[in-house]
Structure formats: structure tokens, C-alpha cells
Amino acid sequence: MDFGFSEEQEMLRDAAKRFLADNCPTKFVRQMMADPTAHDAAFWKKLVDLGWPGLLIPESYGGQGGSFLDMTVIVEEAGKALVPGPFFTSALLAAPLLIEGGSDQQKKDILPRMAKGEFIGTVAIAEAAGCFGFTV
């Protein structure tokens, strides 16, 4: 039984590695570390153009319809490059949670915008009253 990546996934890895070598050098990462937002709109646009924010989003919502194994290939390379910004929280955490737990209306309203990079998701939890329920 072969547990390796497919030929397409290896091609995806090579493309990601080349893209990140060209667009996410250490100097850029250090600049983003010094930026309070750690977000660069031009870099985010490049990720969007590659389809990374929508990789796990179904095609019916404007995404790539990729698998978690496809995302693993991207995340491994992004981790090696220390990719700054909202990619991990939006594409890897928030999008799958919305796909699995969001209402049909939320999916219809938000997922296409996430796939286009227009909506950046994150993960948070709070009590219904709007607090975290911690007692100080």
C-alpha cells in the first residue's frame, strides 16, 4: 500500500516551494513580524491568485474542492517558509469549521468570499451573553 503523495500533490508541493522561495523570503517574514497586523495585502492577493485560501472550500461555493491531503502539502511548505498573515486561521481552521458547522445561509454568504480572499476567517468562541465565561 502506497502512503506517499500523488504525482499531482508533488507538483503542488514543488509549485508552492518555488512560489514561497520567490515571495516569502526571511526578510519579508521579519518585516511582517514587526508589523502589528502581520498582513500584507499584496502577498495575500498572490495566495488568493494561487487558490490557497479556497483550497478546502467546495467548488459549489467557489473554492478548489481540494482534500486535506492537498492542504497538507501546502501547509508543510508554508510552515517551512514561516508564512505570515491569516492563511492558516482562515483557510485551514475557519473554512472547514464553517463547511461542517455553518448554516446553509452562512455557507452561501461567506464561503465564496473566503475562497476569493475577500473575507478572512478566524476561530473564536464566546458565551451567548458575549463573554468568555471566565470568572476573575
Over which residues does each language-model region extend?
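Glycine-rich flavin
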Residues: 13, 21-136
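Intrinsic disorder at enzyme termini
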Residues: 1-8
